[in-house]
């Protein structure tokens, strides 16, 4: 009885019953017409019944399609939910690694601090959205007060690679290695200068004591090196700096580790501020491009200054700038506006100037640059 009820309720059974009924009804109606043969009546009735079966087949196929679409949608939602859970787990793990690494930067053991820095760099590599935050943490570590015996030694600047046998305390030497690790990791996290798709990350090294800082060939957003101690050598050659660059009062005035400052073929897309910067050795800006306002006001070039083939697309200030060594100011493109006021040079050195500039001798044996 139960099977019979199920069969009666089945759409398939109803379809066949309706098809049979239609076959009988159409066939019986056509047989009443004397001009219609029995075979034609059966054929027409069969077509009518078959049409019902065909309609049922179409409905059944559409129903199966909708069921399959709903199943796929449920499967997609389940997959998305699993992906969100996995992503949340990754974020939680990254947050925990980041927080733990930052905490370990305050550890007394230098090897623990080095490990914490590498862990932070690992977080940035696996989670690119952490890169700027990790760079901020590494820069803040370098901004911590630090001194070394070599930075305090008096005497003339010689080979920046030669410490003249001067070593710091064990704590200073260990801390120096930690700081050099931080500098290397910063460089590793910065994109290449020719990577058009990569963002420019900001660096805030205000007041930091850095040694052998080499950011060459990297893309940088905004860079702050105000009042920074630039020991040994500093290399920004081939950099592409998207944001403002501030080197105000940076440099190294004491110690034997006064090195060169290389900025060859560097592109400054916004303002570049070198006001009060002290270049203790050679400063190489050859082929650089300054797209924004450029300021060397009160800057001191104790060594040679090479600005040959530099391109200026905006203004340049050499207000009370002092050149102590050889000078080459034969620009590739002259600035739109120029400020020269007591721009001093040593006339005994080799001086190369644009055709419209000249030297004006002074009573003390020095000379200043003026526009002819």
What would you call each of these model-derived segments?
Residues 75, 84-87, 96-104, 108-121, ...:
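N-terminal leader/targeting and pre-domain segments
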Residues 9-96, 103:
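Membrane-embedded hydrophobic alpha-helical segments
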Residues 1-2:
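Short, Lys/Arg-rich, polar N-terminal cytosolic tail immediately upstream
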Residues 5-6:
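Transmembrane alpha-helix/interfacial motif
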């Amino acid at each position: 009885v139960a099977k019979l009820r199920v069969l009666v309720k089945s759409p398939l059974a109803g379809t066949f019953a309706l098809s049979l009924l239609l076959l009988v009804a159409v066939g019986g109606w056509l047989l009443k017409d004397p001009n219609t043969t029995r075979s034609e009546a059966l054929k027409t009735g069969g077509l009518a019944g078959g049409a019902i079966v065909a309609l049922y087949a179409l409905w059944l196929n559409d129903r199966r399609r909708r069921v399959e679409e709903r199943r796929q949608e449920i499967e997609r939602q389940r997959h998305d939910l699993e992906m969100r859970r996995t992503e949340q787990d990754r974020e939680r793990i990254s947050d925990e690694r980041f927080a733990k690494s930052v905490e370990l930067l305050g550890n007394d053991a230098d090897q623990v601090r080095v490990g914490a820095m590498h862990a932070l760099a690992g977080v940035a590599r696996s989670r690119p959205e952490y890169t700027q935050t990790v760079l901020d943490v590494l820069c803040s570590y370098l901004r911590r007060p630090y001194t070394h015996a070599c930075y305090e030694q008096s005497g003339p600047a010689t080979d920046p690679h030669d410490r003249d046998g001067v070593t710091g305390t064990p704590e200073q030497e260990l801390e120096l290695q930690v700081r050099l690790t931080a500098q290397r990791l910063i460089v590793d996290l910065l994109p290449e200068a020719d990577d058009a798709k990569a963002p420019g990350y900001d660096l805030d090294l205000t007041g930091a004591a850095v040694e052998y800082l080499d950011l060459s060939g990297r893309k940088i957003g905004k860079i702050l090196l105000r009042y920074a101690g630039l020991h040994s050598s500093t290399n920004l050659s081939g950099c592409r700096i998207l944001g403002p660059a501030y080197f105000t009062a940076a440099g190294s005035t004491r110690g034997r580790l006064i090195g060169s400052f290389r900025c060859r073929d560097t592109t400054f897309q916004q303002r570049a501020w070198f006001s009060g910067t002290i270049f203790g050795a050679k400063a190489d800006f050859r082929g650089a491009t300054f797209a924004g306002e450029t300021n060397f006001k009160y800057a001191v070039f104790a060594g040679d200054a090479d600005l040959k083939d530099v391109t200026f697309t905006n203004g340049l200030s050499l207000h009370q700038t002092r050149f102590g060594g050889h000078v080459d100011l034969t620009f590739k493109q002259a600035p739109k506006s120029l400020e020269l006021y007591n721009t001093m040079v040593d006339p005994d050195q080799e001086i190369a100037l644009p055709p419209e500039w000249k030297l004006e001798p002074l009573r003390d044996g020095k000379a200043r640059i003026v526009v002819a």
